[in-house]
Amino acid sequence: MDLFGGSLYISGQIRDGGRTNRAGLDPRRQYFAGMDDKEYAFNRENHRIGAGEFEQVSLMFNGSFPMETGGTFYAFGGMNSRDGESGCYYRRAQDNRTLRAWYPDGFLPLISPTLTDTSLALGMKGIMDGAVFNGYAYDFSVTTGSNEFAWGMQNSHNATAGTGPNQQAEFDLGTLGYSQTTVNFDLATQIEVEGFAGPVDLAMGAEMRMENYTIEAGEEAGYADFGYDVLDGPNAGASAAVGCQCLPGLAPANEQDRDRDAFSLYAEMGGNVTEDLLLDVALRTENYSDFGSTTNGKVAMRYQIDEGVAARGSFSTGFRAPALQEAYFSSIATNFIDGVPLEVGTFPVDTEAARALGAQDLEPETSENLSLGMTYKDDKFSLSVDAYMITVEDRISMSETFRGSGTSSNMVDFFAERGVPAAAGRYF
Protein backbone atom coordinates (compact mmCIF):
# COMPACT_ATOMS: atom_id res chain seq x y z
CA MET A 1 0.00 0.00 0.00
CA ASP A 2 1.05 3.63 -0.60
CA LEU A 3 1.63 5.44 2.69
CA PHE A 4 3.19 8.86 3.39
CA GLY A 5 4.67 8.85 -0.10
CA GLY A 6 6.30 5.49 0.47
CA SER A 7 5.18 1.89 0.51
CA LEU A 8 4.24 -0.72 3.08
CA TYR A 9 3.88 -4.45 2.49
CA ILE A 10 2.30 -6.80 5.01
CA SER A 11 2.06 -10.56 4.68
CA GLY A 12 0.84 -13.32 6.93
CA GLN A 13 0.70 -17.09 6.95
CA ILE A 14 -1.13 -19.77 8.91
CA ARG A 15 0.05 -23.38 8.66
CA ASP A 16 -1.35 -26.56 10.15
CA GLY A 17 0.91 -29.57 9.54
CA GLY A 18 0.22 -33.19 10.35
CA ARG A 19 2.82 -35.67 11.50
CA THR A 20 4.57 -38.43 9.59
CA ASN A 21 5.67 -41.77 11.02
CA ARG A 22 8.26 -44.14 9.55
CA ALA A 23 8.91 -46.07 12.77
CA GLY A 24 7.36 -49.37 11.72
CA LEU A 25 6.50 -52.07 14.25
CA ASP A 26 8.21 -52.50 17.61
CA PRO A 27 9.54 -56.11 17.81
CA ARG A 28 10.57 -55.93 21.47
CA ARG A 29 8.84 -57.74 24.32
CA GLN A 30 6.63 -55.23 26.11
CA TYR A 31 5.46 -57.00 29.27
CA PHE A 32 6.98 -59.16 31.97
CA ALA A 33 7.05 -62.92 31.40
CA GLY A 34 3.72 -64.62 32.05
CA MET A 35 1.65 -61.84 30.44
CA ASP A 36 1.54 -63.42 26.98
CA ASP A 37 -2.12 -62.60 26.26
CA LYS A 38 -1.37 -58.89 26.56
CA GLU A 39 1.87 -59.35 24.63
CA TYR A 40 0.06 -60.90 21.64
CA ALA A 41 -2.64 -58.21 21.62
CA PHE A 42 -0.27 -55.25 21.95
CA ASN A 43 -0.39 -52.56 19.24
CA ARG A 44 3.20 -52.47 18.00
CA GLU A 45 2.80 -49.20 16.13
CA ASN A 46 3.86 -47.49 19.32
CA HIS A 47 6.68 -45.17 18.19
CA ARG A 48 6.63 -41.90 16.27
CA ILE A 49 9.71 -41.32 14.15
CA GLY A 50 9.29 -38.62 11.53
CA ALA A 51 8.10 -35.04 11.19
CA GLY A 52 6.03 -33.82 14.10
CA GLU A 53 2.69 -32.07 13.85
CA PHE A 54 2.56 -28.30 14.25
CA GLU A 55 0.48 -25.14 14.11
CA GLN A 56 2.21 -21.96 12.98
CA VAL A 57 1.25 -18.30 12.62
CA SER A 58 3.57 -15.77 10.93
CA LEU A 59 3.26 -12.05 10.23
CA MET A 60 5.85 -9.95 8.36
CA PHE A 61 6.08 -6.37 7.10
CA ASN A 62 8.42 -4.31 4.93
CA GLY A 63 8.18 -0.57 4.35
CA SER A 64 10.15 2.45 3.14
CA PHE A 65 9.31 6.17 3.23
CA PRO A 66 11.05 9.31 1.93
CA MET A 67 12.41 11.75 4.51
CA GLU A 68 11.97 15.52 4.27
CA THR A 69 15.71 16.03 4.69
CA GLY A 70 16.45 13.61 1.87
CA GLY A 71 17.13 9.92 1.96
CA THR A 72 14.84 7.07 2.86
CA PHE A 73 13.57 5.66 6.12
CA TYR A 74 12.97 1.91 6.06
CA ALA A 75 11.68 -0.75 8.41
CA PHE A 76 11.02 -4.47 8.25
CA GLY A 77 10.36 -7.26 10.70
CA GLY A 78 7.81 -9.70 11.95
CA MET A 79 6.89 -12.43 14.34
CA ASN A 80 6.45 -16.17 14.15
CA SER A 81 4.81 -18.50 16.65
CA ARG A 82 4.84 -22.27 16.34
CA ASP A 83 3.36 -24.99 18.56
CA GLY A 84 4.58 -28.50 17.88
CA GLU A 85 4.25 -32.07 19.07
CA SER A 86 6.59 -34.99 18.47
CA GLY A 87 7.17 -38.36 20.07
CA CYS A 88 10.00 -39.56 22.28
CA TYR A 89 11.06 -43.19 22.56
CA TYR A 90 8.29 -45.49 23.78
CA ARG A 91 8.56 -46.65 27.40
CA ARG A 92 7.58 -50.32 27.62
CA ALA A 93 5.38 -51.74 30.37
CA GLN A 94 8.33 -53.73 31.73
CA ASP A 95 10.60 -50.67 31.83
CA ASN A 96 11.72 -49.46 35.27
CA ARG A 97 10.95 -45.93 34.07
CA THR A 98 7.25 -46.76 33.61
CA LEU A 99 4.78 -46.04 36.40
CA ARG A 100 2.53 -49.02 35.72
CA ALA A 101 -0.18 -47.69 38.03
CA TRP A 102 -0.66 -44.93 35.44
CA TYR A 103 0.51 -46.60 32.23
CA PRO A 104 -0.04 -50.39 32.52
CA ASP A 105 0.72 -50.87 28.78
CA GLY A 106 3.64 -48.45 28.61
CA PHE A 107 3.50 -44.93 27.24
CA LEU A 108 4.85 -42.55 24.60
CA PRO A 109 5.97 -39.18 26.02
CA LEU A 110 5.13 -36.30 23.71
CA ILE A 111 7.37 -33.24 23.43
CA SER A 112 5.19 -30.14 22.98
CA PRO A 113 7.39 -27.08 22.47
CA THR A 114 6.35 -23.51 21.68
CA LEU A 115 8.73 -21.45 19.54
CA THR A 116 8.45 -17.68 19.28
CA ASP A 117 10.58 -15.53 16.96
CA THR A 118 10.47 -11.74 16.69
CA SER A 119 12.54 -9.31 14.63
CA LEU A 120 12.55 -5.60 13.88
CA ALA A 121 14.90 -3.45 11.81
CA LEU A 122 14.77 0.35 11.55
CA GLY A 123 17.11 2.37 9.38
CA MET A 124 17.73 5.28 7.08
CA LYS A 125 19.89 5.60 4.01
CA GLY A 126 20.78 8.22 1.47
CA ILE A 127 23.59 10.51 0.28
CA MET A 128 25.43 12.61 2.84
CA ASP A 129 25.49 16.37 2.37
CA GLY A 130 28.04 18.27 4.43
CA ALA A 131 31.65 19.15 4.97
CA VAL A 132 32.53 15.63 6.12
CA PHE A 133 31.92 12.63 3.85
CA ASN A 134 30.04 14.80 1.35
CA GLY A 135 28.59 12.65 -1.43
CA TYR A 136 29.08 9.38 0.44
CA ALA A 137 26.20 6.90 0.44
CA TYR A 138 25.25 6.08 4.02
CA ASP A 139 23.14 3.41 5.69
CA PHE A 140 22.39 3.55 9.42
CA SER A 141 20.31 0.80 11.00
CA VAL A 142 19.31 -0.81 14.28
CA THR A 143 18.22 -4.45 14.14
CA THR A 144 16.93 -6.53 17.01
CA GLY A 145 15.63 -10.07 17.17
CA SER A 146 14.84 -12.77 19.66
CA ASN A 147 14.04 -16.47 19.81
CA GLU A 148 12.33 -18.29 22.66
CA PHE A 149 11.97 -22.06 22.90
CA ALA A 150 9.61 -23.18 25.67
CA TRP A 151 9.87 -26.92 26.40
CA GLY A 152 6.68 -28.76 27.26
CA MET A 153 5.89 -32.43 27.78
CA GLN A 154 2.62 -34.37 27.69
CA ASN A 155 1.67 -37.97 28.44
CA SER A 156 4.65 -38.49 30.73
CA HIS A 157 5.48 -38.63 34.45
CA ASN A 158 8.29 -38.38 36.99
CA ALA A 159 8.94 -41.92 38.24
CA THR A 160 10.35 -40.67 41.56
CA ALA A 161 6.96 -39.08 42.36
CA GLY A 162 5.34 -42.54 42.38
CA THR A 163 1.60 -42.34 42.97
CA GLY A 164 2.05 -39.45 45.38
CA PRO A 165 0.56 -35.94 45.25
CA ASN A 166 3.45 -34.52 43.18
CA GLN A 167 2.81 -36.82 40.22
CA GLN A 168 1.53 -35.31 36.97
CA ALA A 169 1.35 -36.06 33.24
CA GLU A 170 2.04 -32.61 31.73
CA PHE A 171 5.11 -30.50 32.43
CA ASP A 172 6.58 -27.07 31.85
CA LEU A 173 10.23 -28.05 31.44
CA GLY A 174 11.81 -24.62 31.06
CA THR A 175 12.71 -22.08 28.40
CA LEU A 176 15.74 -21.31 26.23
CA GLY A 177 16.06 -17.74 25.00
CA TYR A 178 18.40 -15.80 22.74
CA SER A 179 18.33 -12.15 21.67
CA GLN A 180 20.63 -10.01 19.58
CA THR A 181 20.72 -6.31 18.77
CA THR A 182 23.06 -4.77 16.20
CA VAL A 183 23.72 -1.14 15.36
CA ASN A 184 25.35 -0.56 11.96
CA PHE A 185 26.68 2.51 10.19
CA ASP A 186 28.02 2.03 6.65
CA LEU A 187 29.55 4.47 4.17
CA ALA A 188 30.34 3.90 0.49
CA THR A 189 31.78 6.03 -2.28
CA GLN A 190 34.22 6.06 -5.19
CA ILE A 191 37.61 7.71 -4.91
CA GLU A 192 40.63 8.29 -7.10
CA VAL A 193 43.77 6.43 -5.97
CA GLU A 194 47.17 6.91 -7.55
CA GLY A 195 48.29 3.77 -9.33
CA PHE A 196 44.78 2.58 -10.20
CA ALA A 197 43.41 2.73 -13.74
CA GLY A 198 40.03 4.12 -12.68
CA PRO A 199 37.78 4.99 -9.76
CA VAL A 200 38.16 2.79 -6.67
CA ASP A 201 35.14 1.58 -4.72
CA LEU A 202 35.52 2.33 -1.01
CA ALA A 203 33.27 1.05 1.77
CA MET A 204 33.70 1.39 5.52
CA GLY A 205 31.61 1.02 8.60
CA ALA A 206 31.17 0.20 12.25
CA GLU A 207 29.01 -2.29 14.09
CA MET A 208 27.97 -2.74 17.71
CA ARG A 209 26.46 -6.11 18.56
CA MET A 210 24.82 -7.09 21.88
CA GLU A 211 23.82 -10.71 22.61
CA ASN A 212 21.99 -12.37 25.48
CA TYR A 213 21.42 -16.08 26.14
CA THR A 214 19.15 -17.36 28.89
CA ILE A 215 18.08 -20.70 30.32
CA GLU A 216 15.06 -20.55 32.64
CA ALA A 217 14.17 -23.44 34.91
CA GLY A 218 10.88 -25.27 34.53
CA GLU A 219 8.50 -26.39 37.24
CA GLU A 220 9.89 -28.51 40.07
CA ALA A 221 7.95 -31.64 39.10
CA GLY A 222 9.97 -31.86 35.88
CA TYR A 223 13.41 -32.18 37.47
CA ALA A 224 13.02 -33.05 41.18
CA ASP A 225 13.70 -36.35 42.95
CA PHE A 226 10.65 -37.00 45.14
CA GLY A 227 12.15 -40.11 46.70
CA TYR A 228 9.97 -42.94 45.37
CA ASP A 229 11.68 -46.11 44.11
CA VAL A 230 10.35 -48.54 41.49
CA LEU A 231 6.97 -49.58 42.94
CA ASP A 232 6.39 -53.03 41.45
CA GLY A 233 7.70 -55.73 39.15
CA PRO A 234 10.86 -57.82 39.60
CA ASN A 235 12.94 -54.67 40.20
CA ALA A 236 10.70 -53.21 42.91
CA GLY A 237 12.77 -51.12 45.30
CA ALA A 238 15.39 -50.17 42.72
CA SER A 239 16.15 -46.49 42.23
CA ALA A 240 13.65 -44.80 39.92
CA ALA A 241 14.65 -42.46 37.09
CA VAL A 242 14.68 -38.83 38.20
CA GLY A 243 12.73 -36.16 36.34
CA CYS A 244 10.14 -36.02 33.60
CA GLN A 245 10.44 -39.01 31.31
CA CYS A 246 12.07 -38.38 27.92
CA LEU A 247 13.37 -34.95 28.89
CA PRO A 248 13.97 -33.99 32.53
CA GLY A 249 13.12 -30.36 33.12
CA LEU A 250 15.68 -27.60 33.39
CA ALA A 251 16.55 -27.09 37.05
CA PRO A 252 17.69 -23.91 38.83
CA ALA A 253 21.24 -25.28 38.56
CA ASN A 254 20.89 -25.13 34.75
CA GLU A 255 19.81 -21.49 34.69
CA GLN A 256 21.95 -19.06 32.73
CA ASP A 257 21.81 -15.36 31.91
CA ARG A 258 24.85 -14.56 29.79
CA ASP A 259 25.72 -11.45 27.80
CA ARG A 260 28.28 -10.56 25.18
CA ASP A 261 29.10 -7.28 23.46
CA ALA A 262 31.22 -6.86 20.36
CA PHE A 263 32.36 -3.74 18.51
CA SER A 264 33.92 -3.81 15.05
CA LEU A 265 35.35 -1.48 12.42
CA TYR A 266 35.76 -2.54 8.81
CA ALA A 267 36.84 -1.19 5.44
CA GLU A 268 37.00 -2.52 1.89
CA MET A 269 38.58 -1.09 -1.23
CA GLY A 270 38.46 -2.47 -4.76
CA GLY A 271 39.20 -1.35 -8.28
CA ASN A 272 41.16 -1.93 -11.48
CA VAL A 273 44.92 -1.53 -11.04
CA THR A 274 45.18 -1.95 -14.81
CA GLU A 275 42.55 -2.56 -17.43
CA ASP A 276 43.01 -6.31 -16.91
CA LEU A 277 43.85 -6.60 -13.19
CA LEU A 278 41.18 -6.15 -10.49
CA LEU A 279 42.27 -5.89 -6.85
CA ASP A 280 40.05 -6.02 -3.76
CA VAL A 281 41.32 -5.59 -0.18
CA ALA A 282 39.29 -5.76 3.05
CA LEU A 283 40.14 -5.43 6.74
CA ARG A 284 38.00 -5.95 9.85
CA THR A 285 38.97 -5.49 13.49
CA GLU A 286 36.66 -6.59 16.27
CA ASN A 287 36.66 -6.50 20.07
CA TYR A 288 34.66 -8.99 22.14
CA SER A 289 33.78 -8.38 25.77
CA ASP A 290 34.74 -11.97 26.64
CA PHE A 291 37.38 -13.00 24.07
CA GLY A 292 39.47 -9.89 23.42
CA SER A 293 40.34 -8.41 20.04
CA THR A 294 41.01 -9.82 16.59
CA THR A 295 41.90 -8.40 13.19
CA ASN A 296 41.22 -10.24 9.94
CA GLY A 297 41.65 -9.41 6.30
CA LYS A 298 41.10 -10.46 2.71
CA VAL A 299 42.97 -9.94 -0.55
CA ALA A 300 41.36 -10.94 -3.84
CA MET A 301 42.54 -10.49 -7.43
CA ARG A 302 41.17 -11.19 -10.89
CA TYR A 303 43.29 -11.02 -14.05
CA GLN A 304 41.80 -10.95 -17.55
CA ILE A 305 44.22 -13.11 -19.54
CA ASP A 306 42.39 -12.86 -22.85
CA GLU A 307 38.90 -12.22 -24.09
CA GLY A 308 36.65 -14.60 -22.14
CA VAL A 309 39.55 -16.07 -20.10
CA ALA A 310 40.40 -14.94 -16.57
CA ALA A 311 42.33 -16.15 -13.53
CA ARG A 312 41.31 -15.34 -9.98
CA GLY A 313 42.54 -15.96 -6.46
CA SER A 314 42.01 -14.84 -2.90
CA PHE A 315 43.41 -15.24 0.60
CA SER A 316 41.54 -14.41 3.79
CA THR A 317 41.67 -15.01 7.51
CA GLY A 318 38.68 -15.59 9.80
CA PHE A 319 37.68 -15.62 13.45
CA ARG A 320 34.64 -17.04 15.24
CA ALA A 321 34.07 -16.68 18.96
CA PRO A 322 32.24 -19.59 20.61
CA ALA A 323 28.49 -19.06 20.47
CA LEU A 324 26.89 -18.38 23.84
CA GLN A 325 24.87 -21.56 23.33
CA GLU A 326 28.05 -23.61 22.81
CA ALA A 327 29.55 -22.23 26.00
CA TYR A 328 26.52 -22.45 28.29
CA PHE A 329 23.85 -24.86 26.96
CA SER A 330 22.78 -27.48 29.51
CA SER A 331 20.28 -30.35 29.22
CA ILE A 332 19.57 -34.02 29.93
CA ALA A 333 17.70 -36.20 27.42
CA THR A 334 17.19 -39.88 26.61
CA ASN A 335 19.44 -41.21 23.84
CA PHE A 336 19.76 -44.75 22.53
CA ILE A 337 23.43 -45.83 22.47
CA ASP A 338 24.12 -49.33 21.14
CA GLY A 339 20.42 -50.06 21.58
CA VAL A 340 20.44 -49.08 25.27
CA PRO A 341 18.39 -46.06 26.47
CA LEU A 342 20.57 -43.72 28.54
CA GLU A 343 19.99 -40.35 30.15
CA VAL A 344 22.68 -38.25 28.45
CA GLY A 345 23.70 -34.89 29.83
CA THR A 346 25.12 -31.98 27.82
CA PHE A 347 27.15 -29.83 30.20
CA PRO A 348 28.62 -26.30 29.96
CA VAL A 349 32.41 -26.46 29.96
CA ASP A 350 32.68 -24.52 33.23
CA THR A 351 30.66 -27.06 35.25
CA GLU A 352 32.16 -29.66 37.58
CA ALA A 353 30.69 -32.53 35.54
CA ALA A 354 32.21 -31.28 32.28
CA ARG A 355 35.58 -30.60 33.90
CA ALA A 356 35.62 -34.11 35.36
CA LEU A 357 35.11 -35.49 31.84
CA GLY A 358 38.03 -33.43 30.52
CA ALA A 359 36.42 -30.21 29.28
CA GLN A 360 38.58 -27.11 28.87
CA ASP A 361 37.75 -23.46 28.30
CA LEU A 362 36.59 -22.86 24.74
CA GLU A 363 38.91 -20.93 22.46
CA PRO A 364 37.84 -18.91 19.41
CA GLU A 365 38.05 -20.64 16.04
CA THR A 366 40.55 -19.13 13.61
CA SER A 367 40.80 -19.91 9.92
CA GLU A 368 42.77 -19.27 6.74
CA ASN A 369 41.20 -19.59 3.31
CA LEU A 370 43.16 -19.79 0.05
CA SER A 371 41.44 -20.16 -3.33
CA LEU A 372 42.63 -20.16 -6.95
CA GLY A 373 40.57 -20.48 -10.09
CA MET A 374 40.07 -19.95 -13.81
CA THR A 375 37.02 -18.91 -15.82
CA TYR A 376 36.19 -19.19 -19.50
CA LYS A 377 33.19 -17.84 -21.37
CA ASP A 378 32.19 -17.45 -25.02
CA ASP A 379 28.89 -17.06 -26.82
CA LYS A 380 27.84 -20.70 -26.31
CA PHE A 381 29.84 -22.07 -23.38
CA SER A 382 31.06 -21.10 -19.91
CA LEU A 383 33.38 -22.91 -17.50
CA SER A 384 34.66 -22.21 -13.98
CA VAL A 385 37.34 -24.25 -12.22
CA ASP A 386 38.33 -23.43 -8.65
CA ALA A 387 40.50 -25.02 -5.98
CA TYR A 388 40.44 -23.98 -2.36
CA MET A 389 42.03 -24.87 0.96
CA ILE A 390 40.57 -23.91 4.34
CA THR A 391 42.52 -24.40 7.56
CA VAL A 392 40.58 -24.16 10.82
CA GLU A 393 42.23 -24.15 14.23
CA ASP A 394 40.49 -24.72 17.59
CA ARG A 395 37.40 -26.08 15.83
CA ILE A 396 34.41 -26.22 18.20
CA SER A 397 32.30 -29.37 18.11
CA MET A 398 30.47 -31.74 20.43
CA SER A 399 32.64 -34.20 22.32
CA GLU A 400 32.06 -37.93 22.28
CA THR A 401 29.50 -39.28 24.74
CA PHE A 402 31.32 -40.54 27.82
CA ARG A 403 29.53 -43.50 29.37
CA GLY A 404 31.94 -46.00 30.85
CA SER A 405 35.48 -47.30 30.81
CA GLY A 406 38.15 -44.71 31.40
CA THR A 407 35.77 -42.44 33.30
CA SER A 408 34.11 -44.41 36.08
CA SER A 409 32.97 -47.96 36.79
CA ASN A 410 29.56 -46.56 37.63
CA MET A 411 28.59 -43.53 35.56
CA VAL A 412 25.36 -42.98 37.46
CA ASP A 413 27.31 -42.60 40.71
CA PHE A 414 29.94 -40.53 38.88
CA PHE A 415 27.35 -37.95 37.85
CA ALA A 416 25.27 -38.24 41.04
CA GLU A 417 28.32 -37.16 43.04
CA ARG A 418 28.22 -33.98 40.97
CA GLY A 419 24.49 -33.43 41.37
CA VAL A 420 23.51 -34.62 37.87
CA PRO A 421 20.88 -37.37 37.26
CA ALA A 422 22.59 -38.77 34.14
CA ALA A 423 24.25 -41.99 33.00
CA ALA A 424 26.43 -40.44 30.26
CA GLY A 425 27.74 -37.01 29.42
CA ARG A 426 29.22 -34.76 26.75
CA TYR A 427 30.23 -31.15 26.20
CA PHE A 428 31.33 -28.71 23.49
Report each predicted region and the residues it spans:
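Transmembrane beta-barrel wall of Gram-negative outer-membrane proteins
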Residues: 1-105, 109-127
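Hydrophobic, lipid-facing positions within transmembrane beta-strands of outer-membrane proteins
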Residues: 6, 55-61, 116-122, 179-185, ...
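Extracellular loop and loop/strand-boundary signature of outer-membrane beta-barrel proteins
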Residues: 44-49, 106-110, 166-175, 250-255, ...
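Outer-membrane beta-barrel signature, preferentially recognizing the C-terminal barrel domain
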Residues: 56, 115-117, 246, 250-262, ...
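Outer-membrane beta-barrel transmembrane domain signature of Gram-negative proteins
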Residues: 107-121, 127-132, 144, 154-278
